[in-house]
């Protein structure tokens, strides 16, 4: 049933937003008056952190600083570093293993589609321009590679209840990439990075980036950064031995990691109107082009695939254009505001990948391509004001967000067939939201942060996302923290478009669970505009200790996940054949599935060994342990992730100029699915093979050559532990990706 609000309700919702804004304005005025209605004058109020800042102290929040990035520079994609945080894995969006080397950021096992990527608080959605296949996967690198390493101030990773204020797509969590701000004095830096693998079958990386900022005139300053990078593709023969497939004119083994060429430029101008108000105007352009390595959805190879892989052809190009205008206000005594208008446009140009049968996800014609266009408009704002209610200190936040998103993908609807005889290639969605949250100091030891967000979606109606986080100081050094929140994700523009179609003549049709026989084709799988949003109740509770360089913590988390959107391939029902476009076919659709549960533990331990608070030598560890991650309906995993992940870092500052870093990451066993949801069949043989536990070690050192010049040399995968991909289809089990062998890297930064 379509839950969109009737026209009569829309003015009511608009009035609700207006009332919220007026309430914020009233509270701002009331704070300068005398005691009235339980609200005392602002002069008596002690300003607390905002709710947004308070939840960053929750157990499920981690921060990667610019210094951390310098110590462990990623080769190209930020996901390489973000994966070292607790609760973070790199995986696909389903247990299928499709496009296994294009892994994305997965927070607490909820899948990449439930990880919201932000740049300076603004949503990034370029991956949404890429077609979603029936197994729930996209052939994409994700959205973690639009900002060059040298431009980052810090990265905030919010997992669980702390992320609920961000709305749709943040059920797993949020990754917020914060860039460097303009400086008061003219300054800049240039960074060059190179990575060379010991085995030439693996791709190498070169990148150069710059960062420049300073004043233009009185009250006017700027910041600009740019980046050029290239990571070569793995050789087509890399997985030959593991898969038993040789490279020839018509055959290529399961693909290794594809390469990528990056070009990024970003500029920001800041106008300080006065001491309390400023405007920021920002614009950016990025180009990402792949270097093809032979990737396809199934194991079938063709002469076209083999030729493109051998050539290292550029088979898809992503162009991203973004711009924003923001106002920041400080009205004194803790009252602040922000208003942002942001635009993002993505052009996805690629060689056509099959939409039918065994050629689904495979390139068959190197001369045939298509373009999809995704445009997003985001308007958001918030107002923070301190209050004192019933003798309690409160920092109240009210805010709103409006998102408009439109997608035009002619190729995905090119079959000319649809359930409703409408083959429009365009789809749109609009979301309007308001939220209110407060940081309340109930006692000197107990702080609670309640909040609620209301979203109205143009297709799927209303959604409420209440949340409650709390922090209690048992002692000055021991804190008990917890939270609970309701999160959601609206169907994406492919899942909800009834004109989006995958078709198969018969071999891709599902098996009937009653007869055990494959359903006779052809079969069509359509988008569905009658879906419900995915929902999750996220809970966590943790204990933390922090004293004189020692830090320890243990957190239990649980996500009760429901309504996950999947392509119904006979698991729920086998539809009767109907006539569509003059042909008798079986119409399947995207549907909401049943309940799932994710439970796990996150822990951390930092040990100061030498120096004050360990500033000379320290050992830092974090652990993620997955207790369960499965559908209650099918008993299948939601994603293929390690049972546990342990990250350890030994950080030694030898002297003022020299420092050393040793790292170790241990991954637990990974189990594959036992049931193939894409055709409703049981997985057998090699498809049930697990990936055993393994460990990766690294070593690096940095030397401050001069005050403005720094060099770092390092070795990744010190003991040369290599993992291979055994198949491109369901026969690979959990062996869905490559772990590259030993690599040597160097990075040089010159600043002024």
Predicted features, each with a name:
Residues 31-71, 120, 330:
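Short, acidic, small-residue-rich periplasmic hinge/interaction motif at the N-terminus
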Residues 35, 191, 441-443, 552-561, ...:
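Gram-negative outer-membrane beta-barrel transporters
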Residues 78-81, 103-106, 118-120, 142-145, ...:
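N-terminal periplasmic accessory domains that precede
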Residues 123-159:
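Short acidic/polar hinge/loop motifs at secondary-structure boundaries
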Residues 127-130, 562, 567, 666-678, ...:
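C-terminal beta-signal and adjacent terminal beta-strands/loops
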Residues 201-293, 319-324, 390:
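Transmembrane beta-barrel wall of Gram-negative outer-membrane proteins
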Residues 304-327, 427-429, 479, 483-561, ...:
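Outer-membrane beta-barrel signature, preferentially recognizing the C-terminal barrel domain
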């Amino acid at each position: 049933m379509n839950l969109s609000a009737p026209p009569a309700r829309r003015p009511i919702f608009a009035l609700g937003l207006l009332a919220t804004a007026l309430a914020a304005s009233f509270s701002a005025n009331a704070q300068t008056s005398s005691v009235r209605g339980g609200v005392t004058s602002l002069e008596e109020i002690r300003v607390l952190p905002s709710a947004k800042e308070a939840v960053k102290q929750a157990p499920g929040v981690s921060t990667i600083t610019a210094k951390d990035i310098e110590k462990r520079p990623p080769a190209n994609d930020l996901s390489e570093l973000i994966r070292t945080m607790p609760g973070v894995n790199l995986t696909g969006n389903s247990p299928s293993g499709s496009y296994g080397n294009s892994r994305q950021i997965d927070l607490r096992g909820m899948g990449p589609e439930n990880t919201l990527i932000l740049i300076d608080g603004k949503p990034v959605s370029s991956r949404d321009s890429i077609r979603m296949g029936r197994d729930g996967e996209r052939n994409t690198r994700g959205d973690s590679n639009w900002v060059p390493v040298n431009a980052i101030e810090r990265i905030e990773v919010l997992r669980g209840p702390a992320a609920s204020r961000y709305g749709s797509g943040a059920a797993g969590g949020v990754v917020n990439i914060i860039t460097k701000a303009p400086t008061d004095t003219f300054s800049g830096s240039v960074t060059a990075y190179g990575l060379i693998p010991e085995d030439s079958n693996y791709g190498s990386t070169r990148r150069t980036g710059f960062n420049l900022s300073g004043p233009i005139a009185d009250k006017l300053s700027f910041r600009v950064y740019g980046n050029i990078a290239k990571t070569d593709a793995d050789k087509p023969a890399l997985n030959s031995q593991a898969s038993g497939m040789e490279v020839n004119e018509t055959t290529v083994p399961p693909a290794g990691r594809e390469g990528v060429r990056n070009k990024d430029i970003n500029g920001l101008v800041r106008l300080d109107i006065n001491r309390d108000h400023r405007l920021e105007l920002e614009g950016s352009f990025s180009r990402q082009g792949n270097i093809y390595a032979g990737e396809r959805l199934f194991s079938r190879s063709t002469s076209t695939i083999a030729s493109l892989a051998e050539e290292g052809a550029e088979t898809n190009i992503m162009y991203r254009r973004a711009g924003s205008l923001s106002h920041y206000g400080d009205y004194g005594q803790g009252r602040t505001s922000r208003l942002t208008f942001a635009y993002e446009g993505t052009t996805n140009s690629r060689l056509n990948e099959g939409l039918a049968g065994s050629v689904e996800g495979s390139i068959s014609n190197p001369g045939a391509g298509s373009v999809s266009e995704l445009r997003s408009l985001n308007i958001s704002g918030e107002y923070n004001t301190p209050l004192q209610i019933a003798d309690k200190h409160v920092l109240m936040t009210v805010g709103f967000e409006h998102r408009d998103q439109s997608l035009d993908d002619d190729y995905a609807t090119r079959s000319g067939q649809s359930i409703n005889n409408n083959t429009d290639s365009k789809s749109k969605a609009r979301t309007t939201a308001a939220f209110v949250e407060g940081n309340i100091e109930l006692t000197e030891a107990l702080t609670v942060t309640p909040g609620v967000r209301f979203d109205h979606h143009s297709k799927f109606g209303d959604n409420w996302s209440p949340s409650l986080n709390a922090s209690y100081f048992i002692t000055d050094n021991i804190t008990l923290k917890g939270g609970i929140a309701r999160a959601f994700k609206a169907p994406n523009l492919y899942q909800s478009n009834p004109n989006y179609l995958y078709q198969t003549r018969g071999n891709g049709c599902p098996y009937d669970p009653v007869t055990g026989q494959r359903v006779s084709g052809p079969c069509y799988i359509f988008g569905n505009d009658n879906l419900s949003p995915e929902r999750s109740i996220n809970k966590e509770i943790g204990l933390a200790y922090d004293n004189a360089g020692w830090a320890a913590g243990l957190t239990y988390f649980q996500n009760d996940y429901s309504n996950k959107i999947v392509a119904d391939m006979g698991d729920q029902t086998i539809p009767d054949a109907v006539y569509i476009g003059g042909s008798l076919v079986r119409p399947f659709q995207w549907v909401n599935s049943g309940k799932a549960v994710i439970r796990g533990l996150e822990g951390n331990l930092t040990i100061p060994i030498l120096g004050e608070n360990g500033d000379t030598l320290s050992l830092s560890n974090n652990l993620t342990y997955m207790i369960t991650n499965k559908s209650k309906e099918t008993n299948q995993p939601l994603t293929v992730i390690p049972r546990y992940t342990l990250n350890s870092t030994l950080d030694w500052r030898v002297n003022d100029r020299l420092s050393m870093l040793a790292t170790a990451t241990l991954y637990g066993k990974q189990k594959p699915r036992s049931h193939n949801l894409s055709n409703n069949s049981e997985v057998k043989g090699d498809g049930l093979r697990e990936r055993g536990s393994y460990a990766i070690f690294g070593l690096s050192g940095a030397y401050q050559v001069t005050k403005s010049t720094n060099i770092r040399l390092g070795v990744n995968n010190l003991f040369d532990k290599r993992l291979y991909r055994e198949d491109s289809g369901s026969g690979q089990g959990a062996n869905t990706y490559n772990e590259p062998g030993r690599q040597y890297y160097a990075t040089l930064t010159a600043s002024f």
